[in-house]
């Protein structure tokens, strides 16, 4: 009997997790079954169970691969790495413009799956514990929360921002608002109701621009004076406007 190579195992498992990802885009995460994956891959039941013990084991590996494939951590570090030359408002503008880019690109991909996992967590916390328990890699939003909390605390200590709440409360607000925007945009994209007068506003870039303005107000961000500030504000504004102009 020929020896099974590591490459063979990796390729087989990737076919299984790729099938799971495709199915999660077509259906809700909670309704994807092991039989669905068997049918999609063409593998036998034993061929699937050889590598994974159940559907949640597959989801866990799928999410790990998603986090490796689509990461915004370097972009977060790049923006926060300019804290000495950019004002807090400019940093906030750039972070949220980056999030708008990410949400637009992944709205019906990773963002959809992430949202449906949060719904599953409410209904079946035992399953989420199994799915997420073995994942060591820090997710995009977890990393953003950790890094921005450090940044806000540092800027407050330097007197560059003047928030009327602590960093933990501020990040809790941002996280909750982001989750609401994510849900609204996904639902609007899946079940667009043309009679709703707000439908046209339920777009990632538009709503995240509103959140940016709210956060800048909450932190009391002060723009530095001079040409650089004007130039930076104009450049950041363009980050938000570019897609809005394309949609009009």
Briefly describe each language-model feature range.
Residues 97-101, 146, 150-158, 172-248:
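C-terminal peripheral helix-coil segments that are non-catalytic and often amphipathic
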Residues 97-105, 114-126, 214-218:
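Helix-loop "lid/cap" segments that line or gate small-molecule binding pockets
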């Amino acid at each position: 009997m020929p020896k099974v190579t590591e490459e063979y195992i990796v390729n087989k498992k990737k076919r299984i997790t790729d099938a799971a990802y495709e199915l999660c885009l077509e259906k809700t995460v909670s309704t994807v079954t092991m039989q669905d994956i068997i049918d999609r891959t063409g593998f036998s039941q034993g061929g699937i169970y050889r590598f994974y013990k159940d559907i949640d084991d597959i989801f866990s590996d799928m999410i790990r691969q998603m986090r490796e494939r689509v990461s915004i951590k370097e972009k977060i570090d790049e923006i926060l790495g300019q804290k000495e030359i950019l004002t807090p408002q400019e940093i906030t503008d750039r972070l949220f413009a980056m999030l708008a880019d990410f949400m637009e690109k992944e709205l019906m991909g990773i963002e959809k799956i992430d949202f449906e996992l949060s719904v599953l967590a409410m209904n079946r916390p035992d399953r989420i514990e199994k799915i997420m328990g073995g994942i060591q890699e820090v997710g995009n939003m977890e990393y953003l929360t950790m890094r921005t909390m450090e940044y806000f605390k540092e800027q407050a200590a330097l007197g560059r921002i003047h928030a009327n709440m602590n960093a933990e409360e501020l990040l809790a607000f941002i996280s909750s608002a982001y989750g609401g925007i994510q849900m609204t945009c996904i639902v609007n994209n899946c079940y667009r109701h043309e009679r709703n007068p707000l439908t046209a506003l339920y777009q990632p870039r538009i709503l995240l621009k509103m959140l940016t303005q709210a956060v800048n107000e909450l932190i009391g961000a002060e723009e530095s004076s001079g040409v650089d500030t004007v130039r930076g504000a104009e450049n950041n504004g363009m980050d938000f406007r570019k897609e809005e102009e394309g949609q009009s």
